[in-house]
Amino acid sequence: MTLTATMVVDKSFKIGEIDKRIYGSFIEHLGRAVYEGIYEPGHPDGDEQGFRKDVIRLVQELQVPLVRYPGGNFVSGYNWEDGVGPVSERPKRLDLAWRTTETNEIGTNEFVDWAKKVGAEVNMAVNLGSRGVDAARNLVEYCNHPSGSYWSDLRISHGYKDPHNIKTWCLGNEMDGPWQIGQKTAEEYGRVAAEAGKVMKLVDPSIELVACGSSNSKMATFADWEATVLDHTYDYVDYISLHTYYGNRDDDLANYLAQSMDMDEFIRSVIAIADYVKAKKRSKKTIHLSFDEWNVWFHSNEADRQITPWSVAPPLLEDIYTFEDALLVGSMLITLLKHADRVKIACLAQLVNVIAPIMTEKGGPAWKQTIFYPYMHASVYGRGVALQAQISSPKYDSKDFTDVPYLDAAVVHLEEAEEVTIFAVNKHQTESLNLQCDMRSFEGYHVLEHIVLEHENMKATNQGREQVTPHHNGDSAIDQGRLTANLAKLSWNVIRLGKK
């Protein structure tokens, strides 16, 4: 039996312009993300700075526009001064967040160099855990002030004459978490974030600031935290952050794939809170959202408990992703696109080795995890304006969710290229979906390609050999303004339409 879903798409019905930064990612000094990940001196494919060129090529393939750095939990115990100046003089430190030893071979300047090589901006986090206002303003001065001051001249003495001009800054990380170094109440964090933001913008008024939201929507303080923090910081910050991770610990596929609905509700809740504070303050300014940690994370939990403390770059959080994980990541990307009017930054956490789309072997190859593909497709083809599609789909209920549409879809219009891209996930476990899509406002368009990611084994991974890869043999056609597409059971689909 084939089920039918319908969709109406009109170029006049817009959600909003997609900020390319929603396809951002994250590199933390954690596990093998930096050392043996992006940086491995002596690797056969290393460059003159020790950065792995195979990793650089894969990041470029993803077209990652922005990378958050250096944490994460790590940043709440990090002294940024440890990572600048002559490498031989940099101290080794205990990283209390992950109970490892940090060598500080890579720091601010080297990471900026790497970001330029991959074509990404840096989204820099400051330490508001063990440190505060003074260290934050000094780091902005070091990075962004041209010359003529202590910290800017120190940067110049370190070989960086031109300022880095980092434009996006995070005011700490997950400050409500009991695991966080320097955990704070909402009042405590709101005050220090406001003061840090104030002085950072005095140093460089052009920067944008992200305030920490709750560590996740299940925190007891969620909602109250956001409202209190924004009450203090509203005049200084531009974004409030969201973090969420999902897993399939119960091996319940229907419930697992429905978790993108939880992400959607989380976004709607934070928008409502931000707009409440806007109304309360009679403000003309709108706070946008930075979903700067999101992914699947659960596979590596048991292995991480076996790691010896205080080692350098141990294999932490090395989830090996399955095909079913790629489907949920696809739905999470669709969810972000559905909120393109308010979610302006997002960071897939993370980028290399640590809960990542890219894995490396020491001295050996780098390879693509299953989740690489939906992330790459969205980043490459999901530029332009998100359209408000009217979707009618059969639905199902799961353990934690009701009325879950089998069809999850988002539509993007890139007007200057005369291209439309439909991203679609069929969550049905046994039946294909016949998609009937009214595209009358896109006269003269035809199907450029229909990319499909599918696999019979939900637990298939790309470790050892690439089993989960997309093909370009999707079944779709457009006739007289009506697109008909067959969406295979449990599949990720990218249907590209154009006039060329």
From Swiss-Prot:
EC number: 3.2.1.55
Catalysed reaction, written as an equation: Hydrolysis of terminal non-reducing alpha-L-arabinofuranoside residues in alpha-L-arabinosides
Subcellular location: Cytoplasm
An example Gene Ontology CC term for this record: cytoplasm
Site for Important for substrate recognition, residues: W297, Q350
Pfam families: Alpha-L-AF_C
GO BP annotations, alphabetical order: arabinan catabolic process; L-arabinose metabolic process
Job of this protein: Involved in the degradation of arabinan and is a key enzyme in the complete degradation of the plant cell wall. Catalyzes the cleavage of terminal alpha-(1->5)-arabinofuranosyl bonds in different hemicellulosic homopolysaccharides (branched and debranched arabinans).
Listed name of the protein: Intracellular exo-alpha-(1->5)-L-arabinofuranosidase
